[in-house]
Design a protein with these regions (language model features):
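Polybasic, lysine-rich low-complexity intrinsically disordered segments
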Residues: 17-19
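Extended catalytic cores of very large enzyme megasubunits
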Residues: 5, 9, 22-928
């Protein structure tokens, strides 16, 4: 039939063609702003090809940056970017939009997150200087807004780089930036309101920033700044460290990554403080000692907290010496206000001295359950109640003696009569010595005070226990640490009774009001030790690689001790004397999935009964053994290497030709020394305590008298004798031989292993935090660009290969809050492997922790994920942890909200809004 021209012009077909023509015409008029500020017309093909090449793992010049990414449609990404182009938009903003869109698609395929990371890496490299030494030079020449010189990096560090610029520049492999996915590289780069790890200089028109590879090289160089070996050996060692960091084999803790090589190298994560129950610097009220640096008073503790928090340190404080409310103060005739007002001052310090303006200060306060103010202590973080009785910005922990747990179990066994078992609340001023003893000695002292009636109150122990559980259900805390377990297995037992842990409950070191313990942290990415057979595509765990990584990581952690800036003299004194470090793990759950292993196997699906997978259990134990063995061996090797030089220095020290202190050498006494002796002093950096003995001159100063000196390593303190075994390449873990080395040479440090939280560094490397299971199969990740939904990459890959990654199953996972347990279409083996942290038995988690324990000489920061905790569930969990001998019973209680999480739509698909109730958002200070 004939169609008139008028009808044709009115038709939808014509309108669609006209709209398309107009859109194309308008788009052709759009311009983009290049990085040099010039404008050029939009070239759609250029936009598409850029994303295409990165998807294929190449740069435009043909440089290979990774494998091709399957499951990713680069055309879709390009179309989305083109649709959002506005006139004069910058090419950098286009890249950011493309990467952000990729991140939003990570729920469809994890490779979108990889593509997003490649886009950001390419964008960042285009806006920075590729040359490492030139970047460091510009950071050194930084100026304040008023024009005054303010270098961002250390002068000595800068001079070393300038002298070795070519060698260091040649070591860097910029393609490794492209290994980081979107969430990892965005965590490194940071953004508005969230500082990243890289150093930046904003100086007028000059905008200088590190690349991730510059960051890793900066850390590597910093850790060798005191290395006095021949230059070629030092540079080889720098490259080894750089390679391990940039390839994701291990990571140093956040403070080390932030501050290495800067003008203030505060590289330590954890500070453990003691306190004395006095407001004065001396017990004599007639004295006027004003040295607040050295006294152990309450104001001295406040000052130390402010100084440490200013430099981004996480703090743990033992409050046990502080007298309870109502106790007489002899010096004034008044009565004590107890611990609450003191804690509120600490709360104000944490808020005011907010880690250099980057984030709130972070303090954890430790108290024992016999404290007369314990109920007020348990209420401090609650949302309700009088403001003058709350301090919600701090974290709280219990330091629990065995006697408390024994009486609690007795009460539970009595059933309805459980309130007949009593517990006495005491004041440390009226009942001295309780916090300074443990085990039988504590029990005898405590019960003698009960018989003498010296307690403040007596209460049913169940009432206190219920108050603890109520606080945990409401706030996620207090942490639970077991005082007697810590001290029976204390590798620093010759120093005294340990009274508290750190901010994240994994560091157990001696501290008091005169010595503040310090710990430097790093974590091994266990995923880097999984090898894939290229022919069979099967995976195996490479124990030899783990061994090598740990030896390197330990040596670098030991180097941190001498490089570090100490905010308080007591911290330096302690760290130089005892030299503890903490090497942990990340990616344990990823390793299990890569090796096709579940945490647990189902033995009866109807009854939902499970047992720990035996292969996972063996892997767990062997990893702990390798890590501890490697660290101890590296430590005794460092001690042996120092012996000859220390012997020469000791002769000079005995003849009074050189003077040392607990802080190092008296510089004046360097005058007149030969060049050889001066070099030895600079290389060995001894303190007086290391010279004041006849043997083990290469070991740390308090080694004599320690359990290790007596032939007892950590596994001996647990009553365990490990067996020798082959790492797979002929390297034998020979424990008796190791003990003989320790006996002969001593140890360079007192402590080696701690499993800390690794929130930030795990996100950078794309691993699950620490040794925790996955929280959900579908979950959210937060970076400066926003909050994005992602899928467990192992689950996505496995279900895709089976043809089961289909919309129906995805929706069921979302409906079940990120769980796959109710999806019967999935094989039982898969449902076992992908149990979430809420679904893995807490008993399994505890047994795995206990079987690592003989080879973790500090502790294990253990969260519990319990969807709806009850008093019965929590009681069983806590008693189970105590019976297994765990030092840290619980870090945080993580629970789901009582309300159904909101399920909202992103790009047409439902996702689960990850709402876990807990008291914190992750510890940055301890993240390693």
């Amino acid at each position: 039939m004939f169609v008139s021209v008028i009808d044709f012009l009115k038709g939808s077909f014509f309108k669609e063609k006209l709209n398309n023509y107009l859109c194309v015409s308008m788009m052709s008029l759009l311009r983009v702003t290049k990085r040099n500020g010039e404008l050029e017309p939009v070239q759609f093909e250029k936009v598409t090809n850029r994303i295409k090449f990165l998807c294929l793992g190449e740069l435009r010049d043909g440089t290979k940056v990774g494998d091709p990414l399957d499951g990713v449609c680069y055309v879709t990404v390009a179309q989305k970017v083109i649709a959002q182009i506005t006139d004069k938009i910058t090419t950098s903003a286009l890249d950011e939009d493309a990467a952000r869109f990729c991140a939003s698609k990570a729920k469809d395929h994890y490779h979108y997150g990889v593509l997003g990371g490649r886009i950001i890496a390419s964008n960042h490299q285009k806006g920075t200087i590729s040359n490492f030494s030139k970047t460091m030079q510009l950071l050194y020449e930084n100026r304040k807004p008023d024009g005054s010189f303010y270098p961002l990096i250390d002068r000595r560090f800068h001079k070393f780089i300038a002298r070795n610029a070519r060698r260091l520049d040649d070591m860097i492999d910029h393609t490794r930036d492209f290994r980081l996915d979107y969430f990892g590289i965005m965590t490194l780069l940071g953004g508005p309101g969230k500082p990243g790890y890289i150093l930046r200089r904003h100086d007028g028109a000059l905008n200088v920033a590190e690349t991730p590879q510059h960051l890793y090289m900066r850390v590597a160089v910093c850790l060798h700044i005191n290395d006095f070996r021949p230059l070629n050996q030092v540079l080889d060692s720098i490259k080894e460290t750089y390679d391990m960091l940039s390839l994701g084999y291990y990571s140093h803790a956040t403070p080390t990554m932030y501050n290495a090589g800067t003008h203030c190298q505060q590289l330590s994560s954890c500070f453990l403080l003691g306190i004395k129950d006095t407001m004065d610097a001396t017990d004599d009220i007639n004295e006027t000692d004003t040295d607040t640096e050295e006294d152990g008073s309450i104001p001295a503790c406040w000052t130390a907290c402010a100084r440490i928090s200013k430099r981004a340190g996480g703090i743990g404080i033992g409050l046990q010496p502080i007298r309870s409310r109502g106790t007489l103060i002899a010096g004034t005739g008044g009565n004590s206000n107890g611990i609450v007002p003191l804690i509120r001052v600490l709360n104000m310090i944490a808020c005011y001295v907010n880690q250099g303006g980057r984030r709130p200060g972070a303090f954890a306060l430790y108290e024992e359950p016999w404290c007369a103010d314990i109920f007020a202590f348990l209420d401090l973080k609650k949302n309700t109640g009088l403001e003058e009785e709350r301090a919600r910005d701090l974290f709280y922990a219990l330091w629990i003696p065995d006697l408390f747990m024994k009486r609690l179990i007795t009460a539970i066994e009595l059933g309805d009569d459980k309130r007949s078992v009593m517990w006495s609340l005491m004041c440390p001023h009226k009942c001295p010595g309780l916090y300074q003893t443990y085990g039988v000695q504590f029990e005898q002292l405590y019960e003698s005070y009960e018989r003498e009636g010296r307690f403040i109150h007596q209460i049913p122990i169940w009432d206190l226990w219920e108050a603890i559980l109520v606080s945990q259900k409401e706030t996620g805390g207090p942490y639970m640490l077991y005082k007697d377990h810590v001290n029976r297995k204390n590798a620093q037992a010759n120093l005294g009774v340990i009274r508290n842990s750190n901010l994240c409950a994994e560091i157990v070191e001696y501290s008091d009001d005169q010595e503040y313990a310090v710990c430097n942290l790093a974590s091994v990415a266990l995923t880097s030790c999984v090898d894939t057979d290229t022919q069979t595509q099967t995976q195996t765990f490479n124990y030899r690689r783990l061994y090598d990584i740990c030896k390197v990581a330990y040596r670098r952690l030991d180097a941190v001790i001498d490089i570090n800036y100490y905010p308080v003299r007591k911290c330096k004194r302690s760290n130089l004397r005892h030299r503890p470090v903490g090497l942990g793990v990340q990616g344990w759950a990823d390793v299990l999935l890569m090796l096709d292993l579940p945490f647990e196997d189902t033995v009866n699906e109807e009854r939902k009964s499970t047992v720990i997978n035996p292969h996972a259990r063996e892997l767990n134990r062997k990893i702990a053994e390798v890590m501890y063995y490697a660290c101890v061996e590296a430590s005794t090797e460092l001690a042996a290497a120092r012996e000859q030089g220390m012997s020469k220095l000791r002769e000079l020290w005995i003849d009074n030709k050189i003077v040392f202190t607990d802080d190092g050498i008296d510089i004046v006494s360097m005058n007149g020394l030969s060049e050889e002796m001066q070099r030895l002093v600079e290389e060995l950096r001894p303190i007086e305590g290391e010279l004041n003995r006849d043997s083990h001159l290469g070991s740390y100063s308090s080694f004599i008298g320690s359990p290790a000196y007596q032939g007892k390593l950590q596994y001996h303190l647990w009553g365990v004798e490990p067996e020798n075994w082959d790492l797979g390449d002929g390297t034998i873990l020979n424990w008796k031989e190791l003990e003989q080395k320790v006996s002969r040479h001593g140890l360079r440090g007192s402590l080696f292993r701690a499993n800390m939280p690794t929130a930030s560094t795990s996100q950078i490397l794309g691993n699950v935090e620490a040794n925790e299971p996955y929280k959900y199969a579908i979950y959210t990740r937060r970076v400066t660009a926003g909050e994005f939904v992602v899928v467990n990459k192992h689950l996505h890959k496995e279900l895709s290969e089976l043809g089961l990654w289909i919309p129906e199953i995805q929706k069921q996972i979302i409906k079940d809050r990120g769980s796959v347990q109710n999806i019967k279409e999935l094989p039982l083996r898969i449902r076992d492997k992908y149990r979430t942290a809420f679904e893995v038995s807490k008993k399994t988690i505890q047994i795995l922790a206990a079987e690592q324990g003989p080879h973790i000489d500090q502790s294990n920061s253990q969260n519990y994920f319990i969807a709806q905790p009850t008093n019965k569930i929590l009681t069983n969990v806590h008693i189970g942890a105590w019976k297994l001998g765990l030092k840290t019973g619980m870090y945080y209680l993580r629970r789901e909200s009582n309300q159904q999480p909101v399920q909202f739509t992103v790009d047409g698909g439902l996702v689960v809004n990850d709402k876990i109730k807990a008291a914190d958002t992750g510890c940055v200070s301890c993240s390693a």
